[in-house]
From Swiss-Prot:
InterPro entries, per the entry: MetalloPept_cat_dom_sf (IPR024079), Neurolysin/TOP_dom2 (IPR024077), Neurolysin/TOP_N (IPR024080), Pept_M3A_M3B (IPR045090), Pept_M3A_M3B_dom (IPR001567)
CC terms in the record's Gene Ontology section: cytosol; extracellular region; mitochondrial intermembrane space; mitochondrion; plasma membrane
Main location: mitochondrion
Protein name as it appears in the record: Neurolysin, mitochondrial
Entry keyword set: Acetylation, Cytoplasm, Hydrolase, Metal-binding, Metalloprotease, Mitochondrion, Protease, Transit peptide, Zinc
Residues with PTM N6-acetyllysine: K664
Keyword Acetylation: yes
The organism's place on the tree of life at top rank: Eukaryota
Segment annotated as transit peptide: 1-37
Gene (name only): NLN
Entry note: cofactor: Binds 1 zinc ion per subunit.
Length: 704
């Protein structure tokens, strides 16, 4: 997705918090588990391990639960008049840090381990810990003491971020129903545990899906030889095509055989159809029930309360307004595509059915790009070998944000293809964090693109700072003999986007783990990474990112100009598809009696103008529904309003590699993490309220 990884976020939001300046007030019986946990939280070090066996994962999961619960119990047993900031809130915040770090080692391997048994153990650990998270987040004794603390402590004597932590803790307690009767609390708790398990299973099913189709060479017509040569062959000399991105999208964009594309699209949008449809049928009503018990009309209303949009009515108005503005552009693009199809069917002797099918869309959008801008992505990718792109990307971010990156030798990683880098502030030499790059597909690996926050950059109990650690997990094509991994331009854009999330994780400098990295409002979290996508649409920036893999020659200037100009190609249909997904997400979380497949089909016809293929159920493959974006997928478009405003008003005006603007962005947008509201950060950066002008221009629309 960003695709946003919510591993750390989930732990942070579900476990009320924790930290350890209760040394003066807690007894010796609590100190032992805290000391045991403290070995994992050391200032300036990456303490993560990736060599745990399934048995160790299981054992350490239970140990973590016992150790963390002891701290919560100690806080919960404090006499109400004994409660202080140090022995209550600070204590909870301290143990939260240790919990997150240890949990990462237990639940992250499900997404990246090459060992199926390790992945299974990690998934079970995630389920077990998620249930524990819910138990701890619904401790009435803890909530009572936090409320008492707010009522009695001198808020003027604690730092603003600590006040925010206190206020958020009480807000989350109420959103967990801790102000409601015990019977209702227990009902909510039971449903939340079930919801958590369903979400984990939904995405596990997608990650573990190993479906492939078999085609003859003739059925792969117009696909480049280097792609076909990279495919695994069957005993009868046919080719295996998986549904992973490096296989699926080249076929859908370049294969001239409609039946091949139809079979691929059908298989892609029926992945996990049976099991994930059942999960959605259970998950969506549970979310609604919990929301209603908490006093909200719908689940969408519940989640939006914490976002910058605030209400379903604002989201609906935004999506409907944008859809109407894009309608003429979408109609024109569909007409152009239909004419292309009609001509090609005549030229190739195919039957012309007079409509754009779901399996036609990517193919003819690719042809549109080639015809209107003379852009051949297969030719162009020869200038984007992954080593050159990576070097250019890292240099860009270093120069722009005042950082230096150093690749670590003999690094402890989860797969030999993974690399690890240390990040330092260029001016001071201070170590800010580390990041892993996991770039190639493997069996059982997370099959989209995401940044995973692994270790929070925050203060430790002794006042020192834990360095942030993140992982960029994507699935670019594997290198083959005589040729490195070559990236399409849209993959270069994905690389920049996800690395923007990595920089958010690393550059945030907060006191509390709960506010570290990308722990901002869900409809703001994409702002920093989307803003940095603009660098792959700039001629000078593209020169830094490209070089022919054979002779090192640069991309011709006229081709670069055409590539940049092609940014607006198909923008109507691409944006309308995002609106479709956003509307489906909103609908499913406002009216749970709806059938997901039917709702998707309805919006595809009404908004996109391209019918969904009968028999498919795209929502069953829609990982965002179970990955932390429930009721919030609109955030991709919503946050782009802000990201485009920042780019055009500052970077475009003052120079996209202007280090002063880059440091302003680092200090005002990245560094605060979630310690400030997203809208406050935007106002600090823009010195005004944000507007839609730049966003509409980026979509080829008139900005009033």
């Amino acid at each position: 997705m960003i695709a946003r990884c919510l591993l750390a976020v989930r732990s942070l939001r579900r476990v009320g918090g924790s930290r350890i300046l209760l040394r003066m007030t807690l007894g010796r019986e609590v100190m032992s588990p805290l000391q045991a946990m403290s070995s994992y939280t050391v200032a300036g070090r990456n303490v993560l391990r990736w060599d745990l066996s399934p048995e160790q994962i299981k054992t350490r999961t239970e140990e973590l639960i016992v150790q963390t619960k002891q701290v919560y119990d100690a806080v919960g047993m404090l006499g109400i008049e004994e409660v202080t900031y140090e022995n209550c809130l600070q204590a909870l915040a301290d143990v939260e840090v240790k919990y997150i770090v240890e949990r990462t080692m237990l639940d992250f391997p499900q997404h990246v381990s090459s060992d199926k048994e390790v992945r299974a153990a990690s998934t079970e650990a995630d389920k077990r810990l998620s249930r524990f998270d819910i138990e701890m987040s619904m401790r009435g004794d803890i909530f009572e003491r936090i409320v008492h603390l707010q009522e009695t402590c001198d808020l003027g004597k604690i730092k603003p971020e600590a006040r925010r932590y206190l206020e958020k803790s009480i807000k989350m307690g109420k959103r967990n129903g801790l102000h409601l009767p015990e019977q209702v609390q227990n009902e909510i708790k039971s449903m939340k545990k079930r919801m958590s398990e369903l979400c984990i299973d939904f995405n596990k099913n997608l990650n573990e899906d190993d479906t492939f189709l078999v085609f003859s060479k003739a059925e792969l017509g117009a696909l480049p030889d280097d792609f076909i040569d990279s495919l695994e062959k069957t005993d009868d000399d046919k080719y295996k095509i998986t549904l992973k991105y490096p296989h699926y999208f080249p076929v859908m964009k370049k294969c001239c055989i409609p039946e091949t594309r139809r079979r691929m699209e059908m298989a892609f949008n029926t992945r996990c159809k049976e099991e994930n449809t059942i999960i959605l049928q259970q998950l969506l009503p549970l979310r609604t029930k919990v929301a209603k018990l908490l006093g909200y009309s719908t689940h969408a209303d519940f989640v939006l309360e914490m976002n910058t949009a605030k209400s379903t009515s604002r989201v609906t108005a935004f999506l409907d307004d944008l859809s109407q503005k894009l309608k003429p552009l979408g109609e024109a693009e569909r007409e152009f595509i239909l004419n292309l199809k009609k001509k090609e069917c005549k030229d190739r002797g195919f039957e012309y059915d007079g409509k754009i099918n779901a399996w036609d869309l990517y193919y003819y959008m690719t042809q549109t790009e080639e015809l209107k801008y003379s852009i051949d992505q297969e030719f162009l990718k020869e200038y984007f070998p992954i080593e050159v792109v990576t070097e250019g990307l890292l240099n860009t971010y270093q120069e722009l944000l005042g950082l230096s990156f150093e690749q670590m030798t003999d690094a402890h990683v989860w797969n030999k293809s993974v690399t690890l880098y240390t990040v330092k502030d260029k001016a001071t030499g201070e170590v800010l964090g580390q990041f892993y790059l996991d770039l190639y597909p493997r069996e059982g690996k997370y099959n989209h693109a995401a940044c995973f926050g692994l270790q929070p950059g925050c203060l430790l109990p002794d006042g020192s700072r834990m360095m942030a650690v993140a992982a960029l997990v994507v699935n670019f094509s594997q290198p083959v003999a005589g040729r490195p991994s070559l990236l399409r331009h849209d993959e270069v854009r994905t690389y920049f986007h996800e690395f923007g999330h990595v920089m958010h994780q690393i550059c945030a400098q907060t006191d509390f783990a709960r506010f570290s990295g990308t722990n901002v409002e869900t409809d703001f979290v994409e702002v920093p990474s989307q803003m940095l996508e603009n660098w792959v649409w700039d001629v000078d920036s593209l020169r830094r990112l490209s070089k022919h893999y054979k002779d090192g020659s640069p991309i011709a200037d006229d081709l670069l100009e055409k590539l940049v100009a092609s940014r607006l190609v198909n923008t109507g249909l691409l944006t309308l598809r995002q609106i479709v997904l956003s509307k489906v997400d909103q609908s499913l979380h406002t009216n749970t009696s709806l059938d997901a497949a039917s709702e998707y089909a309805k919006y595809c016809s009404e908004i996109l103008g391209v019918a969904a293929t009968p028999g498919t159920n795209m929502p069953a493959t829609f990982g965002h529904l179970a990955g932390g974006y429930d009721g919030q997928y609109y955030g991709y478009l919503w946050s782009e309003v802000f990201s485009m405003d920042m780019f055009y008003s500052c970077f475009k005006k003052e120079g996209i590699m202007n280090p002063e603007v880059g440091m302003k962005y680092r200090n005002l947008i990245l560094k605060p993490g979630g310690s400030l509201d997203g809208m406050d950060m935007l106002h600090n950066f823009l010195k005004r309220e944000p507007n839609q002008k730049a966003f509409l221009m980026s979509r080829g629309l008139h900005a009033p």
